[in-house]
Every structure is written in C-alpha cells, then in structure tokens.
Amino acid sequence: MSHNFRNVTMPTALQQLGSMTHRYTINFIYNDLEDFRVTASVRGASIPEAIRHLIGFYPISMTMVGDSIINVECSQKTALRYKGRVIDEKGEPAEYANVVLLSPADSSFLAGGVSNESGYFVIPCNVRRVIAKVTYVGYKSKLWTATSPDLGTIRLQADRYTLKGVTVQGHRLSYKPSPNGLNVIVKGSQLEQFGSAKEMIKHLPLVMGDGTVAGHGTPQIYINNKLVRDASELERLQTAEVLSAEIITRPGAEYASDVTSVIRLKTVRRQGEGWSGSLWGNVEKSKGMLAIANTSLNYRLRNGMDFFIRANAADSKGRITATSNDQLKATDTWDYHSHIKWRNDYKFIYGDVGWNWEINDRHSLGITYSAIGTIKGKRTITKTEQVWRNGEHFSDDDNRSVTKTQPNLSNSINTYYVGRLGKWGIDFSADYYGSHTDSEMAGGTDDASVGSSTNTRSDLWAEKLTVSAPMPAGTLSFGEETSYTNRKADFTQSGFSADTHIRQRTAIWSLYADYALPVGKKLNLSASLRLQNEHNRYDVDGKKDDELSHDYHVLIPKLSMSYADGGWQHSLAFATYRYNPSYSIMSSSVNYRSKYEYDTGNPFLQPMTKYYLSWTTVWKWLTVEAYYAYIKNSFRTFQTAYDDVSHPGVIITDYRNTPKIQNYGVTLNTSPTIGIWHLNYTARLFFSDADLAPMGITHYWNELCTQFRLDNTFTLPYNWTANITASLTPYNKSDVAITKTAASVDLRISKKWLKSKNLQLSLYANDIFHTNYKEMTAYGGINVRTQFKEYDSTQCVGIEFTYSFNTVRSRYKGTRAGSEEKNRL
C-alpha cells in the first residue's frame, strides 16, 4: 500500500490501513492510542511494514497472531502522558529531537522519547511534576520544570557556536554470514556502480575471475526465485535494481544433486504502474569482435499484473591461436609441431514474452515463453602441421575444417505459482524445453577431404513442487521434482569413422526434505536428504542397448552446524553431490579435428559422486574455509592411439572416469572498506591427489596449487567509479599437467549521468599486459604427451551503456524445474 498521513491520530491511521486490506484484521483500543499523532508518507509497504513505520519511536508495540491478526497497543500503561511538539526557529518540525523527563529531586531519569516526522512526541509517565529537557543537534538545549502533561509547542534556537560542517563517517560491512554462506549488500554499496548484474557478480566476495565460486565450482544463479538460463538475463538486470546477493556455498536438498554453489540476487521492492523499460549495449574489440544489444519493456497494471517482452541480439567473432608440440608412442613414435587458429563466427537472437500476476502478498503466478535462435554459426579451424615418424620428417600438412550450424530456434515455456495457504507455503514450477540443431563439417588436407553431418533433437518436460510446513520448532520444507528427457542424435560421415544413430530417454524423479533447527540463540543445526531415482533407455540403431540402459536409486544427504557469537560465525558442513555426464560427452560419434586428431564421447561413462567436508569461519570482512573432497568417477579427457593399423599416427581424445580423486584446500577472502577504497582479495591454496595409475597414466603430480585475485574498486566524486582487478595463477604441477604462470590485469571506469542517474557509460580494458596465456605440458592418456600454448583473445577494449526509465521490480517468481537435465542438454 501507499498513503500519505498528515497529522492524524494513531487510531485514525490504523482505521485507514484496515480499510485497505482484506487479509489483515487490526485490533487496538482507541483510548489507548488517541494521544499519539502521526505524519508519514508510506510507499510500497505491506500492512505490517506500514504500521511499524507509523509507530516509529513511539512506545507502541505491534504483535502478530497467526498470519492475519495484528494487535497494536501502548507498551507503557500510565495514567499520565506528557506530550508536545518540537519545532525549530523557522517553525519547521524538528524530527528526532530527544525529550527526557527528569526527577526534580535528584535529576534522575524518569522517562524519555523522540519526536516524529511532524515533531510530535508522547511520553508515558505517572510523575506529575518533572524537569523536561529537549536536545537537538545544532540547537540549544531547553530545560524547564513542567507541572502539566501538556508541554505545548517547544521552539528551539540555533546554537551560534555550532560547527558549520561535521561529517560523521562509518563503514557498513559489505557482507555478513548466513546459515549457508554469505549475504552481500549491493544497494548503496560500491557494487551498485558496475552497471549490469553480469559484471557485478564478478566482484562479489569468493567469486573468481572465471565466474566460479572459490572451491565450489560454477554457481547456479537466481533472480528473486527465477533460475537464470542465459547470460543476457544478467546483462538486462541493472545493479541499481539489486538489493542484495546471497552466495550459498552449502546448497540444500531442494537444489539439483549437481549444484555445488548458488548465487541468489534479490531485487529492490518497488511499486508503480504503467510503462517501464531499459536499453543496454556493449561493443568490444579484441582480435575478434563482440556486439550485443538488448531492450526490455514492462507494462504494469494497478491490480498487480505485469506484461513484459524482452529482446536481445548478439554478434560474436572470436579468435583463438595456439601452438603445440605433441608426441604419440605407438608402433612408431610420432611427433607433431602445429600452429592452430580457431575462428568462431556466431549470430544469436533471444526473446521472451510473459505475464505474471501478484494477486497479493500471499499469491502470485505467471507464464513465460522464451526463444533462442542461431542466425549464423560457423567455426573454422586451420592447422599447419609438421609430422615426424621415428625421428624422420614424414609430412607437411595444411588442415582446414569448417563446421556450419544451420539456423535454428530453441523454445522453452515456464509457468509457476508461489503462494501461502494458511501457514503452508507452496512453490510450483513446470517447464518445457525443445531444441533442434543441424550442423555440417567439411574439411581435410590437399590430399584428402572428409565430411560429416550431425542432427540433434532434444525435448525436456519437468515440474517441481516445494512445500514449507509449520513446525513447533525450526523450519521444514519438502518437495518433489520430476523430469523426462528425449534426445535423438544422428551422425553420418564420409568414411573416417562410423555412422551412429542414438536415442536416449531419461526419466528422473526425486523426493527431498530440508529441516533447520535453532538451538538457543547461537547454534543452528540443519539436515537435508534427497532421494533420486533415474531410469535410462539407450537405443542404438533403433534397438535397446541393455549395457547402456542403467537405472539408479541414490540417497544424497547433507548436514551442517553453525555457531555464531560476538561477530564470529563458525560452520561445519558435510555434503554429497552427484553429477550425470552431459549428453555431449556421452556421444559415440567420432569427430574429425585434423588429419591426425579425432575426438569422441563415451556412452559408458558412470555418474560422478563427490563427498565434501568443510569448515568455515567468518568474522566481519574476513572469510576462511578449509575443505576436503573425495570424488568417485570424475570425468576427464583421455588421449590414446585411434587405430594403429588403419589410421596410423592418429590421436583420439575421448572421456573416461577417474577411479578416485582427493582434494584438499583453503580459501581466504577479505573485503574491507578503507575510505573510497573497497578491497576484495581472494586467495586459494589446494592440492589434488588423483588415482591415475589404474588408467595407465604414468606422469602425474599432486604439488601445491595457488590462485590469487585482487579486486580494487574506488568510489570517486561526481558519480565516477574506477576498478582495477589483477588475477594470478602461478606455475604449478598438478594432476597430469605442468602449467606455467598466467596473469591478467583489467581496468574499468564508469560514470552515471542525468539527474536520475539512469544513464551509465563504462569503458574497460581487459588483460592489459597480454599475459593471460594457457601454457602447459600434459600427459593425459596412454603414451601421449601434449605441449601447447594458447591465447583466447582476452585482451580487449570495450564500451558499455545502460539506460533505464520508470524502473520497476520484476515480480516474476518462477524457479524453473528440471535444471539438471537442461544443463546436460
């Protein structure tokens, strides 16, 4: 509700609020509150929020009985009430003036209060003769003996000796610990200056430069309750609309079994009606080029309905260069010296249209249709290669392959309902996702040509229901999630491998429950359990393959305990995660990369399971986490000879399960604010101990690995902001690779324009010193050594602009179902 109250009694204001709602019943005694007067402007508040706003500093209490009854009463029952009004020398109300009543006998404190927006105060006190004292910053204190409860109008005089300017400066903590991670304040902080939510997320505590959460992998991201499906959603959301970000490093059972971290963005609650919208654009130049344009429109009705449409177009031309020095030991010893260039040329469009209706603060529903189209898709790989066989020069080859993706459109529909029935909460979502892609590859050398075509069609249906239940102690939520996936893939080729025709159908049904119990004021316990059932049918050339048609029934438990005291919070947590391999790495088709390089998937891959134990300590702006992870059947690429008789010298890359890996690590983050400088420093130290001998791999290490990220933001006058971020990954020997040092320094300068600050321009330069190379020597297979140096054109300059008008908060609350299966597709 929104309303202006002007010098009315508290009972009158409560009666007006009662007439605006059918949900709440407001109970009060008229004579108990008639001495209290209010002047206030309330905007976009619920009924309980409005009552708290009106109460202010008055000695009035508000209590809730159930979900719909509100009792309001004076908390100090006295026969006498001292009341009056404080004004300044110009006759304007003096808000927040301190009024105290003292004993005439010894000047001891009897009672006190604070004036409200209109200068009024009411102080319950049964003593009939008091000393009244009024103090107000910048004005002379007033002291007199009062014998009547009616203190009248008190006019204050300015203090001629008041300092002309006094600045009281403090620093609000940018984040605080939550039961499952960190809550970060965005609104009013330096993070608000980064333009889009996509850019802002990179500067959150614990988030590394590649967008992963330190030690917890790639996060799922939600805007309010809606799962983000594509990066353009984050580009469309402006940081001025974001209230806070919660970084969840211990996700509960309501999340899919492969979700190891979550970032939930909460938007500012705003009210309004009519049209609103935004424009966003970005142009970036590197060795390639990137151009993105985005627009969104929303029309809101007074009854809480929203109609929205969004559109996005992107033109991406990526360039990657690499040199390699590889060796294969088979019947003969083969050495390859190569120079490779990748040229990616893609054009995309995105659009969605939807409707949602926030009926009241207990019920909302909506539906969205989304489409993502590929207008152009082309990848060109050129490779100049010199080949030696047993130390003698064998050939010089110029390889070239061009893969073209035909124009296509993927479609998705999401519908949801979020509401409360009595004390029960309900969150329901249903989804459909469908895609159809055709691609053709043509390539080879001057001596021979090859070709292949791939046709893939995927359909996903899913639904998810979460219920929160009332409990005598603690909180309980439970639910179920169901998904069905039907995927067909046809691969034909010109003779370098074999044709494949695969149909894979997967049905997943899960039950889950979360329970959290506070023990006293300092200790919190939580437990969650997910039962996941999977049925797979794998058909090859129209016939079921029993060896690949697996059924799984697994329990996924999670436990945590947190203790908070004196600004410190300590958490001990255990979690189980389960990952199904993506459909792309389960393909059995053999793809041509060059004359001596093929790649394929592995339909025999087993699901991966990770057991994770962690200890986390948070104090003010400091976070430390130590962890241990035990991983079974992790996925890794594997290289070996393809066919030493028919295709001598060809290396094929596929995927295998690693029997076990043990990871140990410590993550440190510190995010203090010092004047205009906002520091966000993250350091990681970790070991990886993999059991690779059973796979036939002979070279592997488990030495210390480190990563460092120093993120500096400077809040400057006149709405300017500067950010400089440095990342460093030192030389390390871990797993099957020896990796050389990589580093990057990025600079960004932003300025907000217009009185409303609705226009923002940003200039940025990434990898200024051209040092972000990937350079390593790896032994990731049997009798294969790979040395390469690759640069992904991360050095670039760009300009970004954002303009929004009549900004209102999105009310869409759909959470999306079947997220794990859609990510696999």
Report each predicted region and the residues it spans.
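Short, acidic Ser/Thr/Gly-rich low-complexity loop/linker segments typical of extracellular
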Residues: 105-120
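Outer membrane beta-barrel strand-and-loop segments of large Gram-negative receptors
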Residues: 460-464, 508-510, 606, 612, ...
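Surface-exposed extracellular loop regions of Gram-negative outer-membrane beta-barrel proteins
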Residues: 488, 533-538, 563-612, 628-648, ...
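N-terminal periplasmic accessory domains that precede
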Residues: 70-73, 149-157, 197-200, 231-232, ...
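Face-selective signature of the C-terminal outer-membrane beta-barrel domain
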Residues: 348-376, 400-541, 562-571, 622-626, ...
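Short, acidic, small-residue-rich periplasmic hinge/interaction motif at the N-terminus
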Residues: 14, 18-21, 58, 65-79, ...
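Short acidic/polar hinge/loop motifs at secondary-structure boundaries
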Residues: 122-124, 209, 224-252, 295
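Outer-membrane beta-barrel signature, preferentially recognizing the C-terminal barrel domain
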Residues: 404, 504, 547-550, 578-632, ...
